[in-house]
């Protein structure tokens, strides 16, 4: 019927492989926010789903967003440690050295004089991520329902793996644990320097 012919035509449409289509998708994902930027990076590894040229375009997707304000940083630190920034740090750079989709990093100096880099999650990132994941699952199920040929690509499984990966990234304790293990494994290697983590409380 007409509907099935439209489905077949869409799945064969070479626009799915156009680099320009990938660039438009990249801009769209940036507009949608942090979760979708991360998802775009995942899609960049799945040329079997979006096409080689589009995947190549998405590799240019930068995990880089405007930073959130220093007042928000202060509020987060006070909420997490029950004290203001000034009681933990003798110096704290107001402008982050890097701002990505999930967190941003500030250079700072502890009261004791140790120079550190402080990684802070974006405000409400957990809630935003949970909301966006629900939308991605809905879109994946919609794709599988109305475009049966995509089922072999397992869109819902792609979203599931993506969800679990980002959940790990949102838990900075996992990152600290992995870095500590790496430092321990290379403790006897003079040519390797691993980042050490300082627990404030």
Indicate residue ranges for each PLM-predicted region:
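Broad phosphate/nucleotide-binding scaffolds in NTP-utilizing and phosphate-metabolizing enzymes
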Residues: 1-200
């Amino acid at each position: 019927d007409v509907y099935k012919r439209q489905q077949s035509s869409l799945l064969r449409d070479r626009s799915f492989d156009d680099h320009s289509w990938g660039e438009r998708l990249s801009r769209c994902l940036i507009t949608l926010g942090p979760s979708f930027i991360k998802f775009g990076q995942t899609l960049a590894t799945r040329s079997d789903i979006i096409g080689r040229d589009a995947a190549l375009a998405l590799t240019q997707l930068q995990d880089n967003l405007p930073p959130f304000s220093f007042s928000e940083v202060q509020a987060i630190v006070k909420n997490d440690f029950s004290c203001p920034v000034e009681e933990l740090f003798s110096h704290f750079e107001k402008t982050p050295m890097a701002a990505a989709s999930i967190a941003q990093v500030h250079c700072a100096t502890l009261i004791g004089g140790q120079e550190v880099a402080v990684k802070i999650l974006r405000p409400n990132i957990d809630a935003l991520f949970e909301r966006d994941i629900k939308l991605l699952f809905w879109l994946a199920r919609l794709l599988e329902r109305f475009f049966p040929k995509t089922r072999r690509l397992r869109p819902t499984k792609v979203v599931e793996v993506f969800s679990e990966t980002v959940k790990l990234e949102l838990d900075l304790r996992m990152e600290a644990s992995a870095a500590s293990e790496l430092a321990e494994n290379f403790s006897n290697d003079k040519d390797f320097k691993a980042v050490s983590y300082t627990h404030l409380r």
